[in-house]
Amino acid sequence: MELRFPRFSQGLAQDPTTRRIWFGIATAHDFESHDDITEERLYQNIFASHFGQLAIIFLWTSGNLFHVAWQGNFESWIQDPLHVRPIAHAIWDPHFGQPAVEAFTRGGAAGPVNIAYSGVYQWWYTIGLRTNEDLYTGALFLLFLSTLSLIGGWLHLQPKWKPSLSWFKNAESRLNHHLSGLFGVSSLAWTGHLVHVAIPGSRGEYVRWNNFLDVLPYPQGLGPLLTGQWNLYAQNPDSSNHLFGTTQGAGTAILTLLGGFHPQTQSLWLTDIAHHHLAIAFIFLIAGHMYRTNFGIGHSIKDLLEAHTPPGGRLGRGHKGLYDTINNSIHFQLGLALASLGVITSLVAQHMYSLPAYAFIAQDFTTQAALYTHHQYIAGFIMTGAFAHGAIFFIRDYNPEQNEDNVLARMLDHKEAIISHLSWASLFLGFHTLGLYVHNDVMLAFGTPEKQILIEPIFAQWIQSAHGKTTYGFDILLSSTNGPAFNAGRNIWLPGWLNAVNENSNSLFLTIGPGDFLVHHAIALGLHTTTLILVKGALDARGSKLMPDKKDFGYSFPCDGPGRGGTCDISAWDAFYLAVFWMLNTIGWVTFYWHWKHITLWQGNVSQFNESSTYLMGWLRDYLWLNSSQLINGYNPFGMNSLSVWAWMFLFGHLVWATGFMFLISWRGYWQELIETLAWAHERTPLANLIRWRDKPVALSIVQARLVGLAHFSVGYIFTYAAFLIASTSGKFG
C-alpha cells in the first residue's frame, strides 16, 4: 500500500477527504495520539525534539549577530549610541524605486536598511562586545552550538542512546541538575563574564582570550575572597561622572550595592548586576543539592508532599497522591512550566523598562516600547497555553481514585464556588469601570468636565511612597527620613535608589492619578475575565452539571450550541478559544496604557495623558487617532518616507484581522456549499480541469474554522498594533 500522509495515523491516512491533510497537520505534534506510541517512546520523542528546538534558537541568534556584523553599524553606533540609529540588516530589494531607496538609507549606511528596535546593540555593548569581529566570533560559536544540538537530537533517537522511562521519571535528579547545573552554574558563569569582561569593558579595558589571564578584574585579585574581606570588592565604585566604556570616572569595585542608575547610561550599575547574578548563583547552587538521589541524603519530594497533612483535617488529605499525578502527566508538568514561564515573561516586560539593565536602552524609546509590547504578548500566549494543557491533563491524565480528597480533588469539588467568585469579580469590575468611563464621557460631551468622577489611587500612591517616592507627601517607610527602614540602607543602596525613584525622567514608579486608576481597573477586568474563562474551561473539561464525564470526547470537542445538548458548557477547546480573544483584548489595554503614558512622559507633556485618559473619547482621539496620523500619512502626494512600510503594514494588519471574521461568523454548512461550488466550477473549466485532486474537498470542521479565524484575528491584531507602535514612536523620537 502506498504511504500517505500522515504516516503516524493509519486511520487518517485512509480518509478519502481533505480532512486527512488538515487533521494530519493538527495532530502531527500530538504524539500521544499516534499509532504504536508507548509511554517510553512518547518521552523519548519529546526529549529529542528539545534538541531541535535549541538548534533553531541558536541558529536564529547566530543570524542576528551575523547580519549585524555583516550589514550593521555596530562600531559606529558605539561611538555615539544616543544619535546613531542601529541597523538590523540591509534591504536587498527596495520596491517602489528611487524614493524608497532614499527613504530607507539611514544610520550611515550605503543603501536601504532596516533599523533595529530589539535592543541587541545595547545588550552586546553592555556585555563587552566592541567590534564586528566580536560579533562574527559570537555568530560562529552559536552556529557550532546549533550543530551540536542537532547532533544531540539525532543521537538521542538512536536505540543505544535513548534514555529509559525511569530516567525521565526521576524528578529529584532532574531538579537537582536543572537547579544547580542550569541555573546555578550558568548564573555563576555569567557573573564571571560580567566581572572579567563586561565590567573592564565598561572602564575602557578590552579583555579577550589573548589577555584574559593577565588582566586582573580587581587590583587585589582573589585576596579579599580568601581572607574573608569581601567588602573590599565593593569599595571604590564607578563615580557619578563615569563615562561608560572609558577610564574617565571609572572605579575598581566589582560587586556593589549602589542602587539606582548610572547617570550617563540611565541603566543599572553593571557592578550591581554582577552582584545580583552571584547571589542568584549561590542560592541555586544550594537549592540544587536539596533533593534525595543516589546518596540517600536530602529531601524526597514524595515524602514532603505526603507529610504535609493540613492541621485540623479541614482541608482533606492535603498533597497525598500529587507526586505521582504530576510525575506521570506530561500535560500537568507542561501546564506548570508554561504558567511559570508566562508570569516570568510578563515580569521581564515590566522590569526591562522600569529597571533597564542595558546601557543607553532607556533613551531608545522605540526599542523600549517594542520590547515591552513584545514580552507582554508572548506572556499572554504562554499563559493561555498553561490552562489549555491543564484542561488536557484533566481529560487524559486525571485519575479520581489516585487523588481522593486531596487539594486537586477539592479544587474540582468546589469549582462552582471558584467560577462564580471569578464571575462576580469580573462583573463588578466591568460594570463599575465602564460606568465611570461613560459617565466622564457624557460630562465632557456636555461641557461640564468638572463633574467627572475622578478617583485618586491613594493605596497605590501609598505603596509607591513606602518605596521612597516623596511626591505624594506620605511620610512612610522609605519616604520617611527618620524611620528604621530608611536608616538601615542609608549608607548602602538607598541614596542611589531614592534619586532614581524621585527623578521624573525615568520609568521607575511613574506618578499616577485618576486616569491610571481607571485603566488599572479596566486591565483588572480583562485579567479576571480571561482567568474566569480559562479556569472554567479547565475545571469543567471532564464534565459539568449537564454532562457528568466526557473523558472519551477528548479535548477538541466543539461547542455547537444548545441544540446539541449544551456542549458549550464543557468544551475546553472553546474556553481556550474565547480566552485568547480576551487575552489579546487585555494586552491591548495594557500596551495602550503603557505606550500613551510613556509618549507623554518622553515628550514632556504628561498633562495630556492625565487629562484625556479619564474618558473613552480621550483614549480614542488623543491616543489612537492622534498617534496614527503618521501611518495614515505614509503615502502622500510628496512621495514616500521611512514610515511608509509601517503604513502598509498597518493596512495589511487590518486586512488580516478582518479576514478572521469570515471564518468566525459563519456556519459549517456555508463552507461546505461554497467548496462544492468551487470544486464543481473547477472541474468544468478548461485547462483548470487538467489538475485533479484525489481527496474529496470537505469544509473545515467547526473547531478548525474557529482556529483559522482565531489565527487571523490574532496575527492581524498584533501586526496592526506593532506597526502603529513602532511608527508612532519612531516618527516622534527618531
From Swiss-Prot:
GO terms for molecular function: 4 iron, 4 sulfur cluster binding; chlorophyll binding; electron transfer activity; magnesium ion binding; oxidoreductase activity. It is a multi-pass membrane protein. Phylloquinone binds at W671. [4Fe-4S] cluster binds at C559, C568. It catalyses: reduced [plastocyanin] + hnu + oxidized [2Fe-2S]-[ferredoxin] = oxidized [plastocyanin] + reduced [2Fe-2S]-[ferredoxin]. Chlorophyll a B1 binds at H654. P700 is a chlorophyll a/chlorophyll a' dimer, A0 is one or more chlorophyll a, A1 is one or both phylloquinones and FX is a shared 4Fe-4S iron-sulfur center. It comes from the Eukaryota. This is Photosystem I P700 chlorophyll a apoprotein A2. It comes from Sorghum bicolor.
